């Protein structure tokens, strides 16, 4: 170990009071080490030696002298100041970076109080970091849909929409009223025209629709017109609401209509046969009388009166 210059540790006020050369004289260290390898000192001697050294060192500081009274060269003082400034700047730079990251505050002034404030235990910094992080964390939102969102409605826009709906609703009502009036006029026209109109087949006056018949358009009622269009309109067919409907002669059922027609045909045939028989008898009588009359005129009977 190199020797330290003795003039560095001279006492500034009283150089004769204490000399550090005796304490820092390590010239005989090698010899003492060699001797110590051969003979080890006792524990009692060691303890007494340490006690004397401690008493000497305490007397060194109690005599009114200290480290502040020591003489230190200017170069060493400049190096110490540079080292202290470097440490302060390094601590200040790290803390400033943390503050900028966490809270965005301005750079703090590097004073003695701020240095003591910045040197804090780790848990407090973690707690501050957690609080600031929770306050600045942005909550993730849901992904926006592609559907266009309607603008936020206000009371003015709602009033405008209500006014527009009120303006459109009267137009719709007017249209409905006009359509109803037009339908009523059509019904009135049909009623007026149908008041003097009758079905030429069943003589009915009320029908939902007038249809085309053998005498032209709108000459048959709806029921008779449908049967006429299908070729089944016969004299025996009459709707039940017809004023000329007779149960014995008419029906609104096709099956019964066909039966009535068959019965009528049978009656007609019977009548025709009777007429034929009567005509034959009439012909026979007329022919016999004509024969007798013809014979009487052409042939004269003999006269037998002379025989009597």
UniProtKB/Swiss-Prot annotation:
Keywords: Activator, DNA-binding, Metal-binding, Nucleus, Transcription, Transcription regulation, Zinc, Zinc-finger. A zinc finger (GATA-type) spans 193-247. Coiled coil: none annotated. GO terms for cellular component: nucleus. It is found in: Nucleus. It comes from the Eukaryota. Residues 34-57 are annotated as: Disordered. GO terms for biological process: circadian rhythm; positive regulation of DNA-templated transcription; response to light stimulus. Its main location: nucleus. Gene3D superfamilies: Erythroid Transcription Factor GATA-1, subunit A (3.30.50.10). GO terms for molecular function: DNA-binding transcription factor activity; transcription cis-regulatory region binding; zinc ion binding. A motif (Nuclear localization signal) lies at residues 142-149. Disulfide bonds: none annotated. Pfam families: GATA. SMART domains: ZnF_GATA. Belongs to the type IV zinc-finger family. Class A subfamily. Transcriptional activator that specifically binds 5'-GATA-3' or 5'-GAT-3' motifs within gene promoters. May be involved in the regulation of some light-responsive genes. This is GATA transcription factor 9. It comes from Arabidopsis thaliana.
């Amino acid at each position: 170990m190199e020797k330290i210059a003795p003039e560095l540790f001279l006492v500034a006020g009283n150089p004769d009071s204490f000399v550090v050369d005796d304490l820092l004289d390590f010239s005989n260290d090698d010899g003492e080490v060699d001797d110590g390898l051969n003979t080890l000192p006792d524990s009692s001697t060691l303890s007494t030696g340490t006690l004397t050294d401690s008493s000497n060192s305490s007397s060194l500081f109690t005599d009114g002298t200290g480290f502040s009274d020591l003489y230190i060269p200017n170069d060493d003082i400049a190096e110490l100041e540079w080292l202290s400034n470097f440490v302060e700047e390094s601590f200040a730079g790290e803390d400033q970076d943390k503050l900028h990251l966490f809270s965005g505050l301005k750079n703090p002034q590097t004073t003695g109080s701020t240095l003591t404030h910045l040197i804090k235990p780790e848990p407090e910094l973690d707690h501050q970091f957690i609080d600031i992080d929770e306050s600045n964390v942005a909550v993730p939102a849901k992904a926006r849909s592609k559907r266009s969102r309607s603008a936020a409605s206000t009371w003015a826009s709602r009033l405008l929409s209500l006014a527009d709906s009120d303006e459109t609703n009267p137009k719709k009502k007017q249209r409905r009223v006009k359509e109803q009036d037009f339908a009523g006029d059509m019904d009135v026209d049909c009623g007026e025209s149908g008041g003097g109109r009758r079905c030429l087949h069943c003589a009915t006056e009320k029908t939902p629709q007038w249809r085309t018949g053998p005498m032209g358009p709108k000459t048959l009622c709806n029921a008779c017109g449908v049967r006429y269009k299908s070729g089944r309109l016969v004299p025996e067919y009459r709707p039940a609401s017809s004023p000329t409907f007779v149960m014995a002669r008419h029906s609104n059922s096709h099956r019964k209509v066909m039966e009535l027609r068959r019965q009528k045909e049978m009656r007609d045939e019977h009548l025709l046969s009777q007429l034929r028989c009567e005509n034959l008898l009439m012909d026979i009588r007329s022919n016999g009388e004509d024969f007798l009359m013809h014979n009487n005129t052409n042939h004269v009977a003999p006269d037998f009166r002379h025989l009597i």
